[in-house]
Amino acid sequence: MAKKSKQMRAALEKVDSTKAYSVEEAVTLAKETNFAKFDASVEVAYNLNIDVRKADQQIRGAMVLPNGTGKTQRVLVFARGAKAEEAKAAGADFVGEDDLVAKINGGWLDFDVVIATPDMMAIVGRLGRVLGPRNLMPNPKTGTVTMDVAKAVEESKGGKITYRADKAGNVQAIIGKVSFDADKLVENFKAFHEVMVKAKPATAKGTYMTNVSITTTQGVGIKVDPSSF
């Protein structure tokens, strides 16, 4: 614990908490100040001036990062017949129907993404209390309720991320790993930032983005100046 505290202090000394860095500087600092013993994730966090209690100010969606996330996603698909075969051919890790519902209700959660064809949502709905709190419930807005299961599986395996504003208007997302080249992290950040800019609700008032920062799994938060690119 003492060693970790010392590492954190050293990391904090490298970052000026009063300064907003360019995205290139922020990414470089994030890599330099990471002290995790594993290949930590690089994350972005947005504080948005929105009121998610209003239906037209809720922000939720999905996108495919140009350079992926560096994480191998375990994909589960609820489908039957030809669609189940399509999912398997596309590389889904688990495909099924009621058998998977029973398994999940029994405590099994060894998957990262859940996809379902529309006709399967009646049985998937039984898992609301399990999948909902973990942000795993399939949703048309994130492209996880679809008849094109092959595309959904391929995107999930190829760097697709989902995002959603919480009650306080905060949005967090993984944009890669510390091991990524800095330019790839910058490209991923810019792609996600463009999505966040376009997601601004028409009814939002005042400054939309009140804070943008980059951090690693065990690193320090580094403020980013959105006007730097």
Curated annotation (Swiss-Prot):
The keyword Translocase does not apply. The gene is rplA. Part of the 50S ribosomal subunit. GO terms for cellular component: large ribosomal subunit. Binds directly to 23S rRNA. The L1 stalk is quite mobile in the ribosome, and is involved in E site tRNA release. Protein L1 is also a translational repressor protein, it controls the translation of the L11 operon by binding to its mRNA. This is Large ribosomal subunit protein uL1. Pfam families: Ribosomal_L1. Keywords: Repressor, Ribonucleoprotein, Ribosomal protein, RNA-binding, rRNA-binding, Translation regulation, tRNA-binding. GO terms for molecular function: rRNA binding; structural constituent of ribosome; tRNA binding. One of its GO terms (biological process) is regulation of translation. It comes from the Bacteria. Belongs to the universal ribosomal protein uL1 family.
